[in-house]
Amino acid sequence: MADYQFQRVIRFGDTDAAGVVYFAQLLSICHEAYEAAIAALGIELRSFFSDRGSVILPIVHAEIDYQRPTYCGDRLEIELQATALGRDRFRVDYRLSHNHQPVATAQTIHLCLESQTRQRSPLPERLQDWLQITAD
């Protein structure tokens, strides 16, 4: 399976009063990696994440497991893999590490809906292409 690689330095604003990354912030960083992977396909993010398009892709499930804390200044390496789950949804798996040591694993599941009716819809062709690329 082909991975998309993303790097992100932890900023002070990512941390909590204990000086470690706030637990929910790692999911936000995973979403940054997802956005970067979509942008790397040449997809314009403003229209992709807007309800003015023909479809929307809400996250219907998210989970994260933490292996070790991360701190301000740490450089995270994030690998993500996307997998189709039928014709109208897909899963993104994330592996986060720092200095080649596992930090966390996460997963999001996205559902494709018609933006106006909110009914299930097949994944757009460009997204299907991305899923095929990551499956190879």
UniProtKB/Swiss-Prot annotation:
The keyword Iron belongs to this UniProt entry's keyword annotation: no
CDD domains: 4HBT
SUPFAM superfamilies: Thioesterase/thiol ester dehydrase-isomerase (SSF54637)
Gene Ontology terms: biological process: phylloquinone biosynthetic process
Pathway: Cofactor biosynthesis; phylloquinone biosynthesis; Quinol/quinone metabolism; 1,4-dihydroxy-2-naphthoate biosynthesis; 1,4-dihydroxy-2-naphthoate from chorismate: step 7/7
E.C. no: 3.1.2.28
Keyword flag Transcription: no
Coiled-coil stretches: none
Keywords annotated in UniProt: Hydrolase
One term of GO molecular function: fatty acyl-CoA hydrolase activity
Active-site positions on this chain: 16
Catalyses which reaction(s): 1,4-dihydroxy-2-naphthoyl-CoA + H2O = 1,4-dihydroxy-2-naphthoate + CoA + H(+)
UniProt-listed PANTHER family: 4-HYDROXYBENZOYL-COA THIOESTERASE FAMILY MEMBER, ACYL-COA THIOESTER HYDROLASE YBGC
Cited function: Catalyzes the hydrolysis of 1,4-dihydroxy-2-naphthoyl-CoA (DHNA-CoA) to 1,4-dihydroxy-2-naphthoate (DHNA), a reaction involved in phylloquinone (vitamin K1) biosynthesis.
HAMAP family reported in the protein's UniProt record: DHNA_CoA_hydrolase
Entry similarity comment: Belongs to the 4-hydroxybenzoyl-CoA thioesterase family. DHNA-CoA hydrolase subfamily.
Protein name: 1,4-dihydroxy-2-naphthoyl-CoA hydrolase
Source organism per UniProt: Synechococcus elongatus (strain ATCC 33912 / PCC 7942 / FACHB-805)
Species classification: Bacteria, Bacillati, Cyanobacteriota, Cyanophyceae, Synechococcales
